[in-house]
């Protein structure tokens, strides 16, 4: 530091030093900060060195050393300043109380530390107060989650967005068709059918037979899918679209909603079949209700095949009005004529999708899988923005939180001797029976290939068995949050609340994997990080009443197929299976914290249970 340094330009009197400190300036994110005014003047009074200062209150500065491991570190040597400090003669008698160091506010950190760093050994030149690192706030995950929900309305978009996020963070895509070359410290992911994904990170100290910490859930959601040939005859001037409900879709909550269309389109390009994602995110379809004036007919029950058919346009050509559709002309324009896929689809829909994807030759469209979705974006709500209102929360919520937790845990991978894994399955809402579902071989095959890659020659079978035995699975599916209008539907003391943390789901009839041991393991993992963040997630408990039926999760089928210990734990939400549901605005972040604590702490916690 030179004499012209801004910190030395203004001399400070003793009266200034012992007066109330002025409001400090915010620290800059750099390798050095401007020292407090009371400690950086050209004429320094004698100050007794507070050798008994408590840890965290002040650190001494090593002359000529810069603390590069801390974003808020103090600058290096100031020989002139230090010499002035040491040479200043002490007064005969202390007349005033010792100066009060200026209060330095917390500075938000980009990547908060998990544990407080111990004071470093330094010279005795002076003491400088060091600010505490800002703690991670669950609210920081609210907007990223709502953006993800709005931008990825179909399962194809959701999985694709996860894959892109993984690649941005150093994960390498593997193909099940190819041979793998895995290494300790590596990060990888595998897709199946474009609707299921497994990502895993190998600890730097991983050895064959070691366990895996796994968070598994499903990324599919209730929707209405277009039928293979969705073209319908015009009724009373309305153009309608043939759709079929996926799981419990087309319920009463689907009436009068603004519905867009999206999914994946297979296109022939340069002799190859490529997949393109499409999203028509403006209101296209509507399922209109019958006005209550018509009496009993408006009250239902309703036939999903004949009375819940979306309208997508008008065609009054039967009354002499001009029509934008000429079926024969359209078929003739498609190369291949009636045999081409596009000729079997609503022509205005074909044109809209082709325009969105830049397709000029309709005959290059080989096939597609499209579905309806609510176009209303995910939003925060409530007087203090305590809620998130969105579609498809079940279960994009736990899936997204699990992936973020895996990405966050990369910073501690170098000290791990285990596998950290997130598995997102399709078809959970309809029984998980397909190859991309949890009843398929997707998860076992990935773990088997990892075991084979690291196992010594001839020891593959033993390594796989030990891997399963040393692993633990958190089956993460959303949980019913308590509804204040229907309290009698919930079991007392087993009713999770929003913005408190995930809930452990129990069921005495084996619909869930939770037991006393698995609950204790997860609780210990969460307890390890108490106080690290701005808000600690609280593990809540859910169980249905004896007079209610339970849903299911991927947990029991995965645990039974592999022998892996497991627990069911998910994030609470209201209005499950509605087209528009609710969760807490802090719940995505609290879910991330819970899953991250499990991924990072299971290895050490498991030692307590051996």
Segments (PLM) and residue ranges:
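N-terminal hydrophobic/helix-forming segments and targeting peptides
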Residues: 2-4, 10-11, 16, 20-93, ...
């Amino acid at each position: 530091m030179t004499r012209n340094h801004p910190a030395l330009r203004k001399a400070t009197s003793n009266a200034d030093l012992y007066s109330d400190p002025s409001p400090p300036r915010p620290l800059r994110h750099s390798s050095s900060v401007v020292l407090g005014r009371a400690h950086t003047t050209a004429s320094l009074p004698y100050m007794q060195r507070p050798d008994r200062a408590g840890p965290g209150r002040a650190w001494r500065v090593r002359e000529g050393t810069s603390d590069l491991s801390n974003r808020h570190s103090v600058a290096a040597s100031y020989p002139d300043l230090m010499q002035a400090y040491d040479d200043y003669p002490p007064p005969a008698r202390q007349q005033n109380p010792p100066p009060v160091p200026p209060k330095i506010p917390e500075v938000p950190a980009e990547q908060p530390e998990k544990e407080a760093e111990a004071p470093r050994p330094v010279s005795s030149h002076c003491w400088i107060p060091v600010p505490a690192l800002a703690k991670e706030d669950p609210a920081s995950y609210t907007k990223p989650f709502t953006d993800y929900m709005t931008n990825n309305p179909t399962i194809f978009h959701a999985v694709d967005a996860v894959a892109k996020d993984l690649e941005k963070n150093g994960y390498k895509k593997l193909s099940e068709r190819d041979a793998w070359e895995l290494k300790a410290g590596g990060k990888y992911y595998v897709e199946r059918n474009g609707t299921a994904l497994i990502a895993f990170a190998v600890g730097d100290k991983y050895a064959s037979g070691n366990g895996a910490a796994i968070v598994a859930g499903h990324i599919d959601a209730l929707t209405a899918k277009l039928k293979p040939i969705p073209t319908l005859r015009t009724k009373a001037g309305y153009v309608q679209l043939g759709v079929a409900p996926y799981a419990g879709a087309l319920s009463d909550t689907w009436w009068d909603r603004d519905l867009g269309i999206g999914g994946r389109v297979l296109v022939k390009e340069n002799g190859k079949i490529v997949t393109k994602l499409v999203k028509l995110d403006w209101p296209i379809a509507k399922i209109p209700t019958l006005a209550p004036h018509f009496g009993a007919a408006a009250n239902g029950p309703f036939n999903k095949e004949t009375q819940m058919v979306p309208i997508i346009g008008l065609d009054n050509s039967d009354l002499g009005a001009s029509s934008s559709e000429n079926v024969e002309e359209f078929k003739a324009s498609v190369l291949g004529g009636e045999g081409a896929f596009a000729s079997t689809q609503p022509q205005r829909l074909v044109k809209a999708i082709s325009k969105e994807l830049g397709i000029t030759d309709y005959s290059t469209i080989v096939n597609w899988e499209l579905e309806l979705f609510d176009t209303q974006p995910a939003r925060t709500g409530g007087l203090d923005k305590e809620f998130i209102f969105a579609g498809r929360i079940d279960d994009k919520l736990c899936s997204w939180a699990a992936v973020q937790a895996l990405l966050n845990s990369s910073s501690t991978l170098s000290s791990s001797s285990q596998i950290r894994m997130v598995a997102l399955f399709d078809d959970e809402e309809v029984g998980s029976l397909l190859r991309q579902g949890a009843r398929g071989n997707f998860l076992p095959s990935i773990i088997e290939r990892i075991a084979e890659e690291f196992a010594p020659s001839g020891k593959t079978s033993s390594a796989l068995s030990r891997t399963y035995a040393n692993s633990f699975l958190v089956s993460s599916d959303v949980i019913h949050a308590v509804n204040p209008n229907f309290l009698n539907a919930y079991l007392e003391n087993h009713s999770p609340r929003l913005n408190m943390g995930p809930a452990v789901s129990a069921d005495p009839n084996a619909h869930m994997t939770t037991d006393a041991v698995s609950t204790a393991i997860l609780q210990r993992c969460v307890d390890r990080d108490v106080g690290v963040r701005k808000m600690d997630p609280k593990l809540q408990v859910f169980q249905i009443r004896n007079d209610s039926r339970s849903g299911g999760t991927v947990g029991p089928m995965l645990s039974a197929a592999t022998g892996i210990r497991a627990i069911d734990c998910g994030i609470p939400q209201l209005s499950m299976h509605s087209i528009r549901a609710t969760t807490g605005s802090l719940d995505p972040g609290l879910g991330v914290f819970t899953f991250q604590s499990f991924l990072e702490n299971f290895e050490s916690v498991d030692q307590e249970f051996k």
